[in-house]
Amino acid sequence: MKSLQALFGGTFDPVHYGHLKPVETLANLIGLSRVIIMPNNVPPHRPQPEASSAQRKYMLELAIADKPLFTLDERELQRNAPSYTAQTLKAWREEQGPEAPLAFIIGQDSLLNFPTWHDYDTILDNTHLIVCRRPGYPLEMTQAQHQQWLEQHLTHTPDDLHQLPAGKIYLAETPWLNISATLIRERLEKGESCDDLLPENVLNYINQQGLYR
């Protein structure tokens, strides 16, 4: 049996402890062998990043240099068109084969918006969803048919993620750090300290490049 791999996408503008620490805990909780970090190029749902693709990639390389759990996948950065998760996960499934257990990590806030994603209903054909729970967000979807979809796929045991290739949603009890890239950018713009919010080598690079000023 192949070991469970997970993909973790985002803008990472910049990468910070709120990205890394919950996923490291998640890996220990459910037995992830590898987490692939995939930075977006042109996120369809969000404003354009302040840092360039090359700068965001380099910050990620710095952040995971001493963390063997993580690997970096640059495919979305190399696209000139918007990145759609459903397309990316379909391509990943084709690369890994039909039997490999694959998962996509999202936050609870993203789960609530999930039905608005491009071809969202095809994503569970190719991967599981692992949802990192966050305080203050409801556990129910806003529409009845979406709640039914959630309950249909929900599992309470991580074993299902290992034994099945795709199709399950698991709500993980991960620590939540009150850190966001927006907060970091605002603090840097004001000249405030961010020492405890992101890795030191990433912060040094931000200062060297004069980012988020």
From Swiss-Prot:
Pfam families in alphabetical order: CTP_transf_like (PF01467)
Function comment: Catalyzes the reversible adenylation of nicotinate mononucleotide (NaMN) to nicotinic acid adenine dinucleotide (NaAD).
Keyword Disulfide bond attached: no
Family: Belongs to the NadD family.
Metabolic or biological pathway: Cofactor biosynthesis; NAD(+) biosynthesis; deamido-NAD(+) from nicotinate D-ribonucleotide: step 1/1
Coiled-coil region(s): none
Enzyme Commission numbers on file: 2.7.7.18
Name recorded for this polypeptide: Nicotinate-nucleotide adenylyltransferase
Keywords, in A-Z order: ATP-binding, NAD, Nucleotide-binding, Nucleotidyltransferase, Pyridine nucleotide biosynthesis, Transferase
PANTHER family in UniProt: NICOTINATE-NUCLEOTIDE ADENYLYLTRANSFERASE-RELATED, PHOSPHOPANTETHEINE ADENYLYLTRANSFERASE
GO molecular function terms noted in the UniProt entry: ATP binding; nicotinamide-nucleotide adenylyltransferase activity; nicotinate-nucleotide adenylyltransferase activity
Annotated SUPFAM superfamilies: Nucleotidylyl transferase
